[in-house]
Amino acid sequence: MKKPIALAVALAAMALSPLAAHQARAESFCTPGPGDRPETTIQGGLTLAERTVPGGFQGQWCGAREVGHNNLLNEQGLPRGSFGDVQFFGHCAYASMRDPSNLALESTGTAVLDVRVPSNPVWVRTLRTPAMQRAYSAFEIQKNIMISAFKDFGPSGNNWFDIYELGDDCLNPVFRSTSTTASGNHDGWLSPDTNTYYGIPFGGQTIQQNPNRIDVHVLDTTDKAHPVQLLNWNRNQLPPEVRDRVVPTRNFHDVSTNDDGTRLYLDLYGGNNALGGFPADGSGRCANGLIIMDSSDVAFRRPNPQLRFISFTSWCDPKNDPGYHYYDPDFDDGSTAAAHATEYIIHENGKPYVVTTDESAAGLDGDWSVVCRQRTFGRLIDISDETHPRVVSTFKPDIGKPENCQRIMTEQINGGMIHYIGFDDRYHVRLVVYAGANYGIRVVDYRDPEHPKEIAYYKAPSVVTTAAGENDFTRPDPRYDADNCMWYTGWNQGGLRILELTNPEYNGCMRRAVNGGGFLQSGKSKVNFGLQAARGDGGRGALSGSFELNDKEAGAKIHFEQLTLLGSVRDACGAILPTANAVQIDGTGTFNGAPASFRVCVQDSGQQGREKADRIFVTCTAGCSYTKEGEPAGGNIEVAQRP
C-alpha cells in the first residue's frame, strides 16, 4: 500500500524540482563542411523560394550525406509512396507501407531490399502476407524474429498479425504464421526476447462511449506458429486519481518495454488539439504524458497476469494544473501537440531514460500557415526513480519556438515535427536520431543528457510525386547498422535512403585504420601491393595514407597521391561486403603515370593461419580500366577500429 500513497503525492505535487523547471534545449552545433548544403533560414525551416524552384526542392544537409537510395517504384514506374516503417537485418532492409491505395497491387506490401551494396540498394521481392500488406509502426525485428500487424483495424474485423523468421538468407524470410489480435494495431512492440507482443489500437470508440474498449492488448508469441492472446487492458484499470486525469485522452499511441520486459512504457496521445482528437470529455483538459506500468506478470507468465501502475508523468503545460510534472515556458496554455513515440534506452552513463516525441497536425502538414501552433518537441526523461520520472532536456528546433512565429508567417516557412526516433545503441545511447517529417532527419548528441546538441541533419530532395511547393517528409524510426555506421531512413515519396554522418567523432567507421601489404598470385607473376590509411588525432583528424600496386603481367602501376574517403564499404567491391572488419578507401593518383581515380576495398579476416583469408579489391573508377581482386598469397592486411 505504500506505493499508491507515494504516487498520489507525486501526482498532486505543486512545485517543480530545479531540474524540471529549467529544461535545456538542444541547440544546433552543425558546422557545414565540404559537400554540405545547409539550411538558409531558421533551424528546421524551409522557405517558399526553396520549395518552388524549378524541379522541386533540391535537399539540404549538414554533417550527413546520402550513401544510396531506392525510390521503390510501383507498377506505373512512380514512387509507390506511403512509407510505413523501415527495419534492418544482416544485409537486408525491409520497407513497409502505411496506407496503400490498393491492397491488390503486387507492389503493395513490405519490400525486401538487398543492401550488400549500400550505394545501390535493390528491391528484390515483396512480402504480401495479410499483415505485411499494410504494416506501419507495429513492424518490429528482435533477434531473428520479424513481426508485423495490419495498421489500425483490419478489413472485416481481422486484425492480422504475421510472424517471420530471419536467417542467413535474409532476402527470403521464413513465414511462420498469421493470426489475429484482440483489437487494432496502430503501433506495437515485440519484447527483446521475442516472446511477447504489445499492440496499441488507435481510433474507434472513446472510453466514455465504450468503457470496455481496449487500450493495450498482449499476445504470447513464444510459439511462433501459434500465438496466444494473454490479456487486454484499458485505462479504467488505473488508480482512480490517475484514471480521472487521463480519461480525456482519446488514444494511447506508442509502447515499449525495458530489456527484460518487466516494465511497460506507454504514451498518452492527449494533446488539446485536432490531432489529439480534442479532449473526449469536452473538458478542454490536456492529458499528454508517459505512463509506466509493471509488466512482470506478463514477462514471467504468472497466472491471471495484470499490468500494474507505477507512475504517470504529465507534460500538460498550465502552471495551475495540479498534476503537472513538466512546465514548458514557451507554451503555457495547455494546447500541446499529441504525445507520439516512447522508447526505453540506457544512456552511455549507465542510467535508464525514456525518449519521447510529440506530433501535431501542423507539423505533419508542414504548412507555414499553421506551423506556429504545432507545439512539438522531443523529451529525454530520467527514469532512475520510476515513481518520479524527470524531464531533463528537450529537443526543440527553432521552427517550433514562438519567438519565430512572425518570421514563419512572413516568409511562409514550412516546418515539421518530431515523429519517430532511432538510436546508435539502445543500451549505450549517445546519439538520438529524430525523423522530423518535413524538417527531415535530425541527429542530436545526448552525451551530456542535460545539454543536448544537434550535430547533423538531412532533408531529402523532392521526387517526381512530391506535390508542387512542398518537400518530401520522413516519419519512420531511423534504423542503425552499427557495423557499418549507416542509418536506414524512410521517406514518404522518396523511398529508402541510406545515410551516414560525416564527422568521424560520430561515425566510428571513419575512425578505422588499415595497414598492410603483400602480393596476389596472377599466373606465374605476382601483383604486389602496399597500403596504409588512417586519420590523425586518434582517428578524428585529417585523412592521410598511401596505396601502391604493381601488376607486371597486366602492365599496371597504381600510385595514390590523395585519399578522398576512408570508411565502411558502400560501393560494389566484388566479394567484399560491408562488415565491421572491412573498409573502403577511395583516392586519386596515377595509373601508369596518367591521372586516374580508384576504389580499394580490403577485408581483414584475422590472424595468419585462419580458415578464411584476407581479401583485397582494386578498381579504377575514372581515367583507366583495371580491376583486380583476390586473397593475398603472401603478406597481411590489418583493419583496426579506433575508439
Which role fits each region the language model picked out?
Residues M1-V9:
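Bacterial N-terminal signal peptides that target proteins for export
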Residues N581, T588-P643:
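Beta-sheet ligand-binding and adhesion/scaffold domains
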Residues A26-C509:
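Feature marking well-ordered beta-strand scaffolds used for ligand recognition
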Residues L531-F598:
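Predominantly extracellular/secreted and cell-surface proteins with exposed
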Residues S107, N212-R213, K526-N528, A594-F598:
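Short, surface-exposed coil-to-beta transition loops
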